[in-house]
């Protein structure tokens, strides 16, 4: 599901809201999550999961084409850890662990 599909779904489930308002709300939430991570904060949504930033140290990499060693700078990467309720629901709804079918979208 992409962001526009998420906005459309939320708007369909909330007919009292205009789709453009739902889009503004979704964008505001995502912007605030990104801003918090950029400040170094952790964002926890109980039952859903937690967003945080992991710092990867500089390391020596290798160009796969030439085999030459190249330095890879340190970097910060986003990290998401699922919440307990989400894990339980995913395992309850899908006990075999197989990918969900897109037919129900």
Curated annotation (Swiss-Prot):
Keyword Transcription regulation tagged: yes
InterPro entries in the record: Hist_DNA-bd, Histone-like_DNA-bd_CS, IHF-like_DNA-bd_dom_sf, IHF_beta
MF terms in GO: DNA binding; structural constituent of chromatin
Top-level taxon in the UniProt lineage: Bacteria
Gene Ontology biological-process entries: DNA recombination; regulation of DNA-templated transcription; regulation of translation
A Pfam family hit: Bac_DNA_binding
UniProt keywords, alphabetically: DNA recombination, DNA-binding, Transcription, Transcription regulation, Translation regulation
Stored Gene3D superfamilies: IHF-like DNA-binding proteins (4.10.520.10)
One GO term describing the cellular component: cytosol
PROSITE patterns the record matches: HISTONE_LIKE
Keyword Chaperone: no
SMART domains assigned to the protein according to its UniProt record, in alphabetical order: BHL
Quaternary state and interactors: Heterodimer of an alpha and a beta chain.
Assigned protein family: Belongs to the bacterial histone-like protein family.
Its biological purpose: This protein is one of the two subunits of integration host factor, a specific DNA-binding protein that functions in genetic recombination as well as in transcriptional and translational control.
Protein name per Swiss-Prot or TrEMBL: Integration host factor subunit beta
Record organism: Bradyrhizobium sp. (strain ORS 278)
